[in-house]
């Protein structure tokens, strides 16, 4: 949404759906993040409401944007969308990736629990051993105030308290902080990349 639809007046985004992470459905993607085309924000519904939303709003396109899912899961959702009468869209990298001006290594996986965090920390360890300064960027855990979570920077243990991190977030960020490795998170990757440009470093 942020990279392709937020400022694109050719489209009207009527809703997001949520799955896996609890307590997101029933909230709104706030106006402060949604941009000038959405002064009231954008409502977030449970994925189980998908078929009804398509019919209620006469939706033309449903854009799949979840992470950590299998091919089977994606195709099952495409069948649900098509049976409700909408197009099922997968945007490509040119429309979704944000250009980095720093050297960048990405660590990805098909599902939660594959070991992305451990792999990332090992890669950082190897790069730091070569004398490189590395900053980590992690996708957010959107449990709290999304506006406050636009750009989060963690460099000290005090930052964990300042950002009111959950136990899950602390488990993720603390291993970076205790070895003096800065980690960023947040819901706006473009804003995060602008924030880290001043660092003479590589990104993970």
Predicted regions and their residues:
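N-terminal beta-loop-helix "entrance" segment that forms/cooperates
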Residues: 19-41, 145-150
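Short internal beta-strands
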Residues: 12-23, 137-138
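Phosphate-bearing ligand-interacting subdomains
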Residues: 29-94
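Walker A (P-loop) phosphate-binding motif
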Residues: 96-144
């Amino acid at each position: 949404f942020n990279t392709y639809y937020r400022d694109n007046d050719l489209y009207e985004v009527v809703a997001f759906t949520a799955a896996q992470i609890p307590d997101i459905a029933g909230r709104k993607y706030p106006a402060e993040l949604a941009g000038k085309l959405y002064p009231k924000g954008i409502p977030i519904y449970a994925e189980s409401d998908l078929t009804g939303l398509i019919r209620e709003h006469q939706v033309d396109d449903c854009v799949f944007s979840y992470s950590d899912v299998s091919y089977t899961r994606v195709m099952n959702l495409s069948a649900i969308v098509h049976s409700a009468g909408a197009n099922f869209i997968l945007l490509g990298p040119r429309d979704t990736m944000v250009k980095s001006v720093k050297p960048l290594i990405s660590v990805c996986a098909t599902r939660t629990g594959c070991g992305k965090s451990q792999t990332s920390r090992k890669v950082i360890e190897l790069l730091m051993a070569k004398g490189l300064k590395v900053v980590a960027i992690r996708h957010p855990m959107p449990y709290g105030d999304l506006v406050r979570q636009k750009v989060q920077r963690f460099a000290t243990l005090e930052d964990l308290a300042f950002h009111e991190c959950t136990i899950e977030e602390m488990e993720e960020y603390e291993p970076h902080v205790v070895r003096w490795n800065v980690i960023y998170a947040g819901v706006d990757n473009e804003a995060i990349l602008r924030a880290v440009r001043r660092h003479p470093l590589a990104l993970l």
